[in-house]
Amino acid sequence: MDNEQRLKRRENIRNFSIIAHIDHGKSTLADRILENTKSVETRDMQDQLLDSMDLERERGITIKLNAVRLKYEAKDGNTYTFHLIDTPGHVDFTYEVSRSLAACEGAILVVDAAQGIEAQTLANVYLALDNELELLPVINKIDLPAAEPERVKQEIEDMIGLDQDDVVLASAKSNIGIEEILEKIVEVVPAPDGDPEAPLKALIFDSEYDPYRGVISSIRIVDGVVKAGDKIRMMATGKEFEVTEVGINTPKQLPVDELTVGDVGYIIASIKNVDDSRVGDTITLASRPASEPLQGYKKMNPMVYCGLFPIDNKNYNDLREALEKLQLNDASLEFEPESSQALGFGYRTGFLGMLHMEIIQERIEREFGIELIATAPSVIYQCILRDGSEVTVDNPAQMPDRDKIDKIFEPYVRATMMVPNDYVGAVMELCQRKRGQFINMDYLDDIRVNIVYELPLAEVVFDFFDQLKSNTKGYASFDYEFIENKESNLVKMDILLNGDKVDALSFIVHRDFAYERGKALVEKLKTLIPRQQFEVPVQAAIGQKIVARTNIKSMGKNVLAKCYGGDISRKRKLLEKQKAGKAKMKAVGNIEIPQDAFLAVLKMDDE
């Protein structure tokens, strides 16, 4: 193909993604677009076609982004090439969304006709505007009995500033309005810029590991051309590889001769090491490199850390390999080795949020068959010590002694909640209970209020979202962003079993809540830890001071069962012997701690 043909082809390319709040029908709309462009044989069609992980189908959510090429014959007689990049909607996966948007020129904004605009919708709109994308608003689910398309149209105009007349009314389930959406994509989304004669610049926006072919990177070509046999260079690492295959996803992978300006496809270059094909990096040609890399996207830092330990210590190395493979297309995952007296060797792992943590844990157990114990999640604290030095703590067990610490800072987030009027009181009460600071309240219309609070991240990550949903009968939506670290009066609480500290059960708590949390936790552990042959004291301590204690009663074995009648001294001898045995057991006794006990640290607020 010569450059003239490439430029002509470029004019007919449209790259777009679909953004929406969770459950507003993104994946269903993607299915309909695939169906109506005849990209998928009817016999291969299934719901949530682009959600390729079993986990995504079971939970009904999108976790990974997916890119697919479609052909569309428009009413103007031209055939257009669409690249649809499906994105997740959950707040933990904002990073995936920002990666998808970096590869697009436009975005379909899907809003539920009954729910209207929600917190996540707005967050994604701001991301799209930051990337200078054209927005195509679609109101989905208009055939629902509770649908109010006119009200939602007004919301889109008032809150986002898009013209009502541009809004497409649709129902992805019933296949209404899909044709109009496809025509609008041609009209609204601009063709990609870029020069096929310039040095190659391609953005890696996703990558996955294939045990046979090595790393498969999803790329968006901005300038230049790439084909099999080219020698490419990664601009971040400077490493060079030979391209063995380039291709497109139709959702199946299909090799092609070349990828040129505006194309979205995949590239295989026998890259064996996960670190050599980092998401956000720029690929260029070794023989004619580009002068500077493309603007990547902002690196997301983990918000929540927890320890992952294999139940069987033999799996320690397998766990490392599993984490490395997951990290390949999940750049926000971080991990480093960690050892615990209670649990042996494992990894301290960083996540974007609790859903992200659950998903990774479940993927390791399913895809790699490694059984895990996870410790209670914790956020990152900054400690300024008396000698002026600074320490970062992401594991409560590593917190320095209280007398060495001058100040402790913890991360705060700005939380935006959209709630129906009736529940404002309940939501504000929840935020006060979570040490929140009221910032602002906005009545959007006569039904909904936008409430903004500053909250400690530690209070948000565990079960804030669940409690917010239950306090508002599921109507609230929620989005948060990190603002800064603030000084707090925090203490580390240790849990002692049988007089020994269990490092994996330590947690950091605000001094005002320390006594209640400690008392509630020891009571909870009493019910979760199996009874032993001897009595086990469970204590909560701050430094040397014990703030709460309870005992797990011993299992009584009746040593007198075989004594029928007989002398009292015989019975006493047996009881003394049992007592001595128990004392010895208590001295050397090892107590098995079940997984539920580690999670009990989180669930303290529910009591």
From Swiss-Prot:
The protein's enzyme class: hydrolase
Catalysed transformations (reactions): GTP + H2O = GDP + phosphate + H(+)
Recorded superkingdom: Bacteria
GO biological process: positive regulation of translation
Pfam families the UniProt entry points to: EFG_C, GTP_EFTU, GTP_EFTU_D2, LepA_C
Sequence ranges assigned to domain tr-type G in this UniProt record: 11-193
Subcellular location: Cell membrane
Alphabetically ordered keywords of this record: Cell membrane, GTP-binding, Hydrolase, Membrane, Nucleotide-binding, Protein biosynthesis
Membrane topology according to the record: Peripheral membrane protein
Coiled-coil region(s): none
Binding site for GTP: D23, H24, G25, K26, S27, T28, N140, K141, I142, D143
Cellular component terms per the entry's GO annotation: plasma membrane
GO terms for MF: GTP binding; GTPase activity; ribosome binding; translation elongation factor activity
InterPro entries per UniProt: EF-4, EFG_III/V, EFG_V-like, EFTu-like_2, G_TR_CS, LepA_C_sf, LepA_CTD, LepA_IV
Main location per the UniProt record: membrane
EC number: 3.6.5.n1
Cysteine pairs bridged by disulfides in the record: none
CDD domains per the UniProt record, alphabetical: EF4_II, EF4_III, LepA, lepA_C
Family: Belongs to the TRAFAC class translation factor GTPase superfamily. Classic translation factor GTPase family. LepA subfamily.
Protein's job: Required for accurate and efficient protein synthesis under certain stress conditions. May act as a fidelity factor of the translation reaction, by catalyzing a one-codon backward translocation of tRNAs on improperly translocated ribosomes. Back-translocation proceeds from a post-translocation (POST) complex to a pre-translocation (PRE) complex, thus giving elongation factor G a second chance to translocate the tRNAs correctly. Binds to ribosomes in a GTP-dependent manner.
UniProt-recorded name of the protein: Elongation factor 4
Organism: Staphylococcus aureus (strain MW2)
